[in-house]
Amino acid sequence: MPVSHASSAETVAPGASRVSVLLPLPLAGPYDYRTDGATGLTRGDFVIVPLGTRQVVGVVWGEGTGDVVESKLRDIVAPVDAPPLPPVLCRFVEWVANYTLSPPGAVLRMAMSVPAALDPPRPIPAWRLADDLPAQLRVTPERQRIIELLRDGPARPASELAREAGVGLGVVKALAAAGALVAVALPPPAAFDLPDADRAGPTLNPPQSTAAMELARKVASGGFTVTALDGVTGAGKTEVYFEAIAAALQGGRQALVLLPEIALGAQWLDRFAARFGARPAQWHSDLTAAERRVAWRAVARGEARVIVGARSALFLPYPELGVIVVDEEHDAAYKQEDGVIYQARDMAVVRARLTDIPIVLVSATPSLETVQNVAGGRYAALHLPDRHGGAQLPIVTAVDLRADRPPRQSWLSPILRKALGDTLAAGEQALLFLNRRGYAPLTLCRACGHRLQCPRCTAWLVEHRLVGKLQCHHCGFQVPFPGACPSCKAEGMLAACGPGVERLTEEVTALLPAARTAVMTSDTITGPLAATELIRRVQDHEVDLLIGTQMIAKGHHFPMLTLVGVVDADLGLHGGDLRAAERTYQLLHQVAGRAGRADRPGRVLLQTYEPKHPVMQALVAGDRERFLASEADDRQSVGMPPFGRLAALILSGPDADAVDNIARTLARAAPHGDGIEILGPAPAPLAILRRRHRRRFLLKCRRDIAPQPLLRHWLGPVKLPASVRLQVDVDPYSFL
């Protein structure tokens, strides 16, 4: 079982006259406030305190520092009647703040993202039968049914009484007015049904059973461990880690499951309900404010036993957390790129260590970081070598576009066109993958050559023909598609260059007019309900051909889908991203894994101009280990992660000269020494974003050198003008 982490720093001495309070604001640290000493405050308690002319809710962080003289202290207004933040969450907030060089209050804000959850839950008005009915009470048959219901059962709300008795609401009100009913307040019902850990699950094959028993053993034993659960697509990894969740529930603990795209988790939720007889609590940005309030409070009170959520679910106040599962641990969506910049997979490992519980990292394409941690003995590994139920892995073929060229102004090669026709003729389903939203990535004028660019960024505007707009995918700027060139004013001369999913859909509709097509992108799937409905249509074979971006790679199971066509397998292979090859391999492997997941064999066609690229060869040969070994050698030879450490600095401001001046100041003060290298300053690849000029530094250091002390010493003395922002990204994943 998890051990207690209580320490003197987590308590407030009885009778203390001052306490430090951390506010959920991007401030340097806690502020001292006066307390009467009799309130009995402890670390993690919520309190209302004055800040300037307003009142805010903060968290007691410990005893006061004494840095402020007594005469200048302000009084705590009142404690808040809400479950306190658990001590381990307070330490987690501090750890994340120190690691990411973020203000502690900014991290605390993620743990207090639902202020309304701190309000006490509203009781439900109800009625019970009076102990003595009025002597003159006139009892009609309708009234008698109400009386009998309450005589034999508990108090009920008026609407429930009326419904069960088959009478109008006025009958209940009349009985109350006559003194036959007494008003009472009922506590709110449980927000979530309890999962049944002992409910029979699906039959596991021997490798699954072995892995499930090992995970369940670790959860039952407690203590911090990290296990990488690795297996081919369709191996049944989800059913394996469900047994780890069951072990946590049987031990009276909560379980947290992180998913990269919780809005696409409809199939996952169905599988969970089939195993445990109830649905878990959910936590993601598509919840309403009321749903978030209910979920936060249910987690804090221990009423929500299993929580599935996006990366921010890490910061919920679990009082009894027993296991963490990070599904699709390789997914780039776990990196938060704004506000407090953090990698949720890595922070989940930290949270598990601080809580002293096991964590499971799950993927068919584990990240190189996880692979190296397994190789170094820091993580344990469990492997599922085969698809569940006897399904075979698909046959992957690289289509050389240099030899098998698509027709002019088309994007599908003759081989892929024929495969699509044959698949649909056989009554099976196909999937076309192109990781590019919109109609075309570039629009140019055939008269003057002008390229339509975002006025706020150094990025091309993307045509979205379905809505008749040009959009910037970086800042959100959009404008109606012009009838004439903005530069030379020539009409009808704007041409689309390159394909997006909308243009691909247009081609497929012309090629296969009878096919029932559907598109799955962030433009067409606007929330969980839309995703659930589309997945249902594909499962029920109401769709013949599914076209989409990376959303379609996220673990979906479509038994009749036997063909996957990757329209541009080279997309994302090149550029300044050190993980470009790894990410491309992971994404294409996951997409390929949608084919042939049942009893029909699957086939994958990768359209590429580089069939000899190591990524393509690894996918065709099914040789992941060789690719990862080659990728590791390349990174290690230049000291790049996971064999070295990186931290990115991004300066930005509306005036390029002001940004450049600060960049030169930072360059002169840059740290140096053995194992330390500073790259930059240089214009960022995305040199202007939202009208702000951007300059980048990259701090590169040996694996045994922590970048945070270097960054604090380097950046501490620098005074930024109000117009210039400095963003620090420890362990960067984006290099734009």
Where are the model-predicted features located?
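Conserved helicase motor "Helicase C" RecA-like lobe of SF1/SF2 P-loop NTPases
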Residues: 265-275, 444-456, 503-516
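Long, charge-rich boundary regions
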Residues: 471-559
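Cys/His-rich Zn2+-binding cysteine-cluster or related metal-binding knuckle/ribbon modules and their
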Residues: 26-28, 285-290, 301-304, 338, ...
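Conserved RecA-like helicase motor-core motifs
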Residues: 256, 276-287, 455-456, 462, ...
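Accessory helical-bundle/CTD segments and flexible terminal tails appended to RecA-like ATPase motors
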Residues: 109-138, 449-453, 511-516, 527-546, ...
